[in-house]
Amino acid sequence: MENKAILETERLILRPWNIDDTPFLFKYASDPDVGPRAGWPPHNSLEESRQLIETIFNNDTTWAMVLKDVGEPVGCIGYLRHNNANIPIGEEEAEVGYWVGRPFWNNGLCSEALSCLVEYCFNTMGIKCLWGDCFTDNPSSARVMTKCGFTNCHIERKCESLIVGKDKPVMLFKLENKNNIIMNELIACCGLNCEKCDARMATINNDEELRKKTAKFWGELNNCEISPD
């Protein structure tokens, strides 16, 4: 089990779903224009929403998107590990997914939530690469990912595991953990790959710290100068 976290942004609190959220989930997930865009059918009853909270949403990688101004869940965000992702990915990678109720479309909430999730996945969970996908006729979802730094892989494929739209192509997007990229490049360049290196590099949590520590660390080991700029 992964450590379940409560995350917070300027306008949102990302927290676990609970049974009391059932009416809010049903209110937005029953909209026929919401679920099919993300590959799942509209909810047909409060009982269906309740069961999904108790089963599908009852894990350590799914969060309710609670809008602070209204104090209720207005959407959902999370990630899937390689063993249950909709697309083939590596063991140290994950697939992100998100949706928000129609009254809150075009307000930047999904981008705000995804940006927070990316930081959590990379800096706390140590995930090396994040993948995202959306139907080719859903440019709004594509914009969310590109706004958060994801790159369009220009690859289209079908996701047989989807409940709705398994016969439709999806576009793939990718975002690599910068800390991991630079660490691997430095190790490959200098030919060093030891426990000491891994322990020192594992303390890096952001780009500025990364530049400073790599410059100092690798300069010490190799008697050379590496500019932090």
Locations of regions flagged by a protein language model:
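Short, surface-exposed helix-loop/turn micro-motifs enriched in polar/charged residues
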Residues: W40-P41, P88, L186
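A short helix-loop-beta-strand connector motif used in the catalytic cores of GNAT acetyltransferases and
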Residues: I53-A64
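Hydrophobic scaffolds flanking metal-cofactor catalytic centers in soluble metalloenzymes
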Residues: N184-D229
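Conserved GNAT-fold acetyl-CoA-binding loop/helix
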Residues: D33-E54
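Acyl-donor (CoA/ACP) binding surface of acyl/acetyltransferases
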Residues: M1-D33, V66-I182
